[in-house]
Amino acid sequence: MIESVIDTNYRRLIDGRSIDISLGGIHNIVIGSDIDDTFQEPVSVEDLSAIMADGTGVKQQEGRKGELRAVIGITKAGRVEPLGSFTNTAWPEIERNIKERIEEAEPYNIPFIYDGEPGLDDFLADVAESQRCTWHGARGLYHSLWQDGLKKKYSQPETDKIKQLIGIELPKGDFEILKEEDKETVKSKYESSKTEIKELIKTFREKGYKNGASYLENLSDLLFTNIEIWLKTGVIAPKTTSLLERLFREIGRRLKKIAWGWSDKAVTNISKMIMIRQYSRDKWEQYWKDKLGIKGYFDIEIMSVNLPSCKHF
C-alpha cells in the first residue's frame, strides 16, 4: 500500500488497483507510520564528498503554504544519502538534528553546498566548509545588477564572465599520481580567478553598481570551496545543488498527486518515505522486513506455473 501511494496518484491507485480506501485513510496510514523515528543511525562524514540542504514550498491544510526542507549527503561514489526531511522546521533545529547523527566531532574536508537560502550561511560549519552553488551564484548576480538598473543585455557579459571564472574543471583520476604541473595549472586558474573577481568588484563600485558589488563580495569567498578542498585532499566534490533539486522535483511531483493539504507530520513522513525508497533501497527493504518480522531463514523459489485451459473461451 505505501509503495503504491508513493508511486502513483490517488485516483489511479483506487481505479487501477481496486483498492477501497479513502484519501483520509491513506493519510492516517502515513501519519501513523514510525518512519519519522527510524533511520536515525550515525552518519560518517568520512564517507561523503558533500552535504546539501534546501527548502521548497508545499500546499497544506486550508490553503496554507508550508516549507519542506531536506538535507542530503553525496557519497564519494556520487550517490545520494538521505539525511533528513522536515516540514515547517527552523534551520537551527534541523542543524541540531543532523549534528546528533554525525559521528565526527571536528571539521572535515567536505563542502556544505547551498543556494543562498537565508539561515544556511553557517549551517554545519563545525564539520563542513560552506560552498555556494555556482549555478545559483551567477544567477543571483544577474538579479543584483538588475536592482542596479542594468538590463539583461548589459549584465549578461558580467554574469558570463563569472560563470567562466568559477567554471574551473578538475582533472579526473587518482590525485596522488597526477603530474605536479596539472595540479599547478588548477592552482594557477584558481588564484587568477579570485584576483579577477576582486577586480570585478572594484569595477562595479566605480560604476556605481552597489548591489552587484555587495553581492559579489559576499559571494566571492564561497565559490571556490570545492577547488580548495581538491588542492588539499584530492577529493572531487560537487559544486552545485542539482542533485538536491532533482530530489525536490521527485518529492514535489508525488506530494501534488497524493499529499496536498496534509499536516506537517504527514508531509514529513511521506517525503522521508520517498527519499529512502528512491535513494536507499537496501534500508527501505530492511525496514519492511523488520516491520513484517521477516528473518530471511529460507527462500521461496517458484520453479514453474501451469495454468489449466478455460472451457468458457
Question: Could you describe each region identified by the protein language model?
Answer:
Residues 127-149:
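Inter-helix linker motif
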Residues 103-131, 156-313:
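Acidic/histidine-rich catalytic cores and adjacent linkers
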Residues 1-3, 249:
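Contiguous, well-ordered alpha-helical segments that form the cores/surfaces of helical PPI scaffolds
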Residues 24, 28, 118, 136-139, ...:
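Residues on a specific face of well-ordered alpha-helices
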Residues 3-12, 16-123, 219-227, 243-244:
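RNase H-like nuclease fold core
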Residues 59-62, 137, 260:
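A generic structural signal for short coil/turn motifs at secondary-structure boundaries
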Residues 65-68, 144-156:
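Short, surface-exposed amphipathic charged segments that create phosphate/polyanion-binding patches used
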